[in-house]
């Protein structure tokens, strides 16, 4: 028997459903990592979707070993540049920034985003970070990296997106040595993630503005005699007399979309350097041509085309093992209709 009581279909865990503060997503936690020092994550711009024909390598699957069609999302991932290194300490009140070191060799477009340091002594700042590590004050190190959308033809903007990405692996001394090595240099997705790995993708979803309770919460349209009151796409009532106010759990109209969402355990099917091999005839709708490095992610990714997408190693990977998928075909059929 179906469930009779169905006040809403949406989760209250995301309330209040308001617009994201920034189109650049933020991570509050990172997965454990025990390998060599590396930057945990990367960022790119969503291009669109296509499909591939690959061999099903999922054990115990009814189609194991057979060719299956899989939808994929294309994310263009040009090299990012490390602008600085930030050291965090931790006390009873939580994490807080201690000190940081910036490079002076920055792209001119970054000045559109922040006030870039002009008379910054990079060597002295790095020594201050190393001293804080030696004194045991530092708990974590983060790389301050920014994207380079000015190198993309499909993203019509010049302003880079700046973000923090944790440096993990080895001891703190190894991490600060690695941070000093990559400071001011480019990093690529191939150095951080590998084909077949499971990742988490985070982006700000497509904004839909103000929507009613039927679309926003999935409540039913009024039926039969209930619709004779003149309104159909509304809720039955706003709640009891007492408490003498409208509770926040009541499904009402309001902002829908443009909220940060994370989807877990997405598999990387391919990392490529030449976007021409996956660009359909006429280009991707609402994006255009992919000319540089790209990544194919199984399934969908939040947000519209051209939206910034952050990628990190899966934090809830479970028993998934890294297996290189066998892709036999990538659809480049025109999407123009």
From Swiss-Prot:
Single GO biological process annotation from the record: translation
Family from the record: Belongs to the universal ribosomal protein uL3 family.
SUPFAM superfamilies: Translation proteins (SSF50447)
Native source species: Methanoculleus marisnigri (strain ATCC 35101 / DSM 1498 / JR1)
Any single GO CC term annotated in Swiss-Prot or TrEMBL for this entry: cytosolic large ribosomal subunit
A Pfam entry, by short name: Ribosomal_L3
NCBIfam families, per the entry: L3_arch, PRK04231.1
InterPro entries per record: L3_arc_euk, Ribosomal_L3_dom_3_arc_sf, Ribosomal_uL3, Ribosomal_uL3_arc, Ribosomal_uL3_CS, Transl_B-barrel_sf
Cross-referenced PROSITE patterns: RIBOSOMAL_L3
Lineage of origin: Archaea, Methanobacteriati, Methanobacteriota, Stenosarchaea group, Methanomicrobia
Assembly: Part of the 50S ribosomal subunit. Forms a cluster with proteins L14 and L24e.
Keyword line: Ribonucleoprotein, Ribosomal protein, RNA-binding, rRNA-binding
Name of the protein in its database record: Large ribosomal subunit protein uL3
Gene Ontology terms, MF aspect: rRNA binding; structural constituent of ribosome
Region Disordered, residue ranges: 1-28
């Amino acid at each position: 028997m179906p469930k009779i009581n169905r006040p809403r279909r949406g989760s209250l865990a995301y309330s209040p459903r308001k617009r994201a503060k920034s189109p650049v997503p933020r991570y509050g936690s990172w997965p454990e990592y025990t390998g060599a020092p590396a930057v945990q994550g990367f960022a790119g711009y969503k291009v669109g979707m296509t499909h591939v024909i690959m061999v099903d390598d999922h054990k115990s699957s009814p189609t194991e070993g057979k060719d299956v069609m899989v939808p994929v999302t294309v994310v263009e991932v040009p090299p990012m540049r490390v602008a600085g290194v930030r050291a965090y300490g931790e006390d009873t009140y939580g994490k807080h920034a201690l000190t940081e070191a910036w490079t002076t060799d920055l792209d001119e477009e970054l000045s559109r985003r922040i006030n870039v340091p002009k008379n910054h002594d990079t060597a002295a700042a790095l020594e201050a970070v190393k001293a804080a590590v030696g004194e045991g004050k530092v708990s974590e190190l983060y790389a301050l990296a920014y994207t380079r959308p000015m190198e993309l033809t499909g993203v019509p903007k010049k302003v880079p997106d700046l973000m923090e990405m944790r440096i993990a692996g080895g001891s703190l001394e190894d991490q600060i040595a690695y941070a000093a090595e990559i400071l001011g240099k480019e990093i690529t997705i191939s150095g951080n993630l590998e084909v077949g790995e499971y990742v988490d993708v985070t982006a700000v979803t497509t904004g839909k503005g103000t929507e009613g309770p039927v679309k926003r919460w999935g409540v039913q349209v009024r039926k039969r005699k209930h619709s004779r009151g003149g309104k159909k796409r509304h809720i039955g009532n706003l709640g009891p007399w007492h408490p003498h106010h409208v509770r926040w759990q009541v499904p009402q109209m309001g902002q829908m979309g443009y909220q940060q969402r994370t989807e877990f355990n997405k598999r990387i099917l391919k990392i490529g350097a030449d976007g021409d091999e996956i660009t359909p005839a006429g280009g991707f709708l609402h994006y255009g041509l992919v000319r540089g490095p790209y990544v194919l992610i199984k399934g969908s990714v939040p947000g519209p085309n051209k939206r910034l997408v952050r990628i990190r190693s899966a934090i809830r990977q479970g028993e998934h093992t890294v297996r290189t998928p066998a892709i036999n075909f990538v659809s480049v059929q025109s999407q123009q209709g």
